[in-house]
């Protein structure tokens, strides 16, 4: 909630340094495996980045975005979910995509996903804990890095969340 207050006041300060995105994604993967030991899942990191590439970004905030997208993929899926985290360069920009085969999101809700406190209505058995701030924070962070974040989803087929930021 502190981050939300800072966003509202436009007081988020980025502390950019060179970061190793594949290492960061692997760390989040390990962390989530510990947090969700009772939910069978597979997380694959597909690293298509040039060897040794480092990106100039705020590591703490970018790691938060990656964690939020990966954790949402776990939370909003049934047991056995397969999550693919793809890391690549497109037009000299870092592209990170998190794809799952989970519940998916209806088009009418996709427009509102990045709105603060918005939560997709779910059936009682699909309802998850949360405040509806993670995607709004992620959008803010990516925008502050000069990038963009988007979603592609279909109900019953899963979702792909992608963000793109400059490498420098």
Language-model region placement:
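A conserved beta-strand-to-alpha-helix junction within the catalytic ATP-binding
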Residues: 15-30
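Short helix-loop "hinge" at the ATP-lid/N-box region of the Bergerat-fold HATPase_c
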Residues: 73-74
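Conserved glycine-rich
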Residues: 146-147
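Short alpha-helical Gxxx[C/S/T] motif in the catalytic ATP-binding
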Residues: 134, 138
């Amino acid at each position: 909630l502190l981050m939300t207050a800072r966003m509202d006041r436009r007081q988020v300060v980025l502390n950019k340094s060179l970061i190793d995105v594949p290492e960061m994604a692997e760390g989040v993967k390990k962390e989530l495996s510990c947090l969700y030991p009772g939910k069978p899942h597979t997380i694959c990191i597909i690293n298509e980045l040039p060897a040794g590439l480092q990106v100039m970004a705020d590591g703490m905030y970018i790691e938060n975005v990656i964690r939020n997208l990966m954790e949402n993929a776990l939370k909003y899926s049934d047991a056995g979910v397969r999550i693919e985290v793809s890391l690549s360069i497109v037009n000299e920009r870092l592209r990170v995509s998190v794809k799952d085969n989970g519940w998916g999101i209806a088009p009418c809700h996709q427009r509102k996903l990045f709105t603060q406190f918005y939560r997709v209505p779910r059936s009682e058995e699909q309802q998850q804990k949360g405040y509806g701030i993670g995607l709004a924070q992620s959008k803010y962070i990516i925008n502050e890095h000069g990038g963009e974040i988007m979603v592609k989803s279909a109900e019953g087929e899963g979702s792909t969340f992608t963000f793109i930021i400059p490498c420098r």
